[in-house]
Curated annotation (Swiss-Prot):
The keyword Nucleotide-binding applies. Its main location: cytoplasm. Coiled coil: none annotated. One of its GO terms (cellular component) is cytoplasm. Nucleotidase that shows phosphatase activity on nucleoside 5'-monophosphates. It is found in: Cytoplasm. Its cofactor is a divalent metal cation. GO terms for molecular function: 3'-nucleotidase activity; 5'-nucleotidase activity; exopolyphosphatase activity; metal ion binding; nucleotide binding. It comes from Neisseria meningitidis serogroup C / serotype 2a (strain ATCC 700532 / DSM 15464 / FAM18). A divalent metal cation binds at residues 8-9, 39, 91. PANTHER family: 5'-NUCLEOTIDASE SURE, 5'_3'-NUCLEOTIDASE SURE. This is 5'-nucleotidase SurE.
Length: 248
């Protein structure tokens, strides 16, 4: 089996090294990732300039583009490697709740899913770098189960690993997405020339972390698996919307 691996933290990140190393024990691996950190770019494509594909000394390929670009190139350029699965991550920091809409890590998996390829996004609920051992041990458990009976139809799973010591992981839970409040205000500043600039403010606090959500369960020490879908249609609102637009 062939697994194409990407991320949004860049090809030099610790997370993608862990993901590639463990996955290589179960399948053939090819890494195609952004050349630099592209966190928060979501499903964006690079359309205003050409892309370049280069190979690093460790064998990983990198692209001067987005995670979505990487999936397109990974599936189009290599005649000797067509992915059976796409793994994205391991992201340095969680991708839970509505964060998934902004995540380039989740976007890479989403793009693969749109191509008909089963895809999984992996994230670690920690940005300090302290819990990579937990992520690696959890990944061994997850992939051993995954490859024992691989999915036969396209799936899109978002997996978050808790920020606890390896022995304190409590198991796996299937969880729905939680919610955050909207992000905090932009931060005004001045550049060295005295010109007005702005920084995007911090993320909002979590507003829905009850039992059964990814925020709640991962925060309680569980690995969370959330099945995602692409269809954004609000089906419960179809009748009300029709009544509004068809009213006399």
């Amino acid at each position: 089996m062939n697994v194409l691996i990407s991320n949004d933290d860049g090809y030099l990140s610790e997370g993608i090294a862990v993901l590639a190393r463990v996955t290589a024990e179960f399948a053939n691996v090819r890494v195609v990732a952004p050349e630099r950190d592209r966190s928060g770019v979501s499903n964006s494509l690079t359309l205003e300039r050409p892309l370049q594909l280069k190979q690093a000394q460790n064998g990983f390929y990198y692209v001067n583009g987005t995670p979505t670009d990487c999936i397109h190139i990974g599936q189009s350029v290599f005649s000797d490697f067509q992915a059976d699965f796409v793994f994205s991550g391991i992201n340095r920091g969680a991708n839970m709740g509505d964060d998934t809409l902004y995540s380039g890590t989740v976007a890479a998996a989403t793009e693969a899913y749109l191509m008909g390829i089963p895809a999984v996004a992996f994230s670690l609920n920690d940005a300090s770098g302290r819990y990579w051992a937990t992520a690696e041990k959890a990944l061994w458990t997850l992939l051993a189960h995954f490859f024992k009976n691989p999915p036969q139809s396209p799936i899109l799973w978002n997996i978050n690993i808790p920020a606890v010591e390896p022995e304190d992981v409590r198991g796996i839970k299937i969880a729905r997405l939680g919610r955050r409040h909207h992000g905090q205000n932009v931060i005004p500043a001045r550049n060295p020339r005295g010109e007005q600039i702005y920084w995007i403010g911090p993320v909002g606090r979590v507003s829905d972390k009850e039992e059964g959500t990814d925020f709640g369960e991962c925060g309680a020490g569980f690995i969370t698996v959330t099945p995602l879908q692409i269809d954004l249609t609000a089906y419960p609102d179809m009748a009300e919307t029709a009544a509004f637009w068809h009213a006399d």
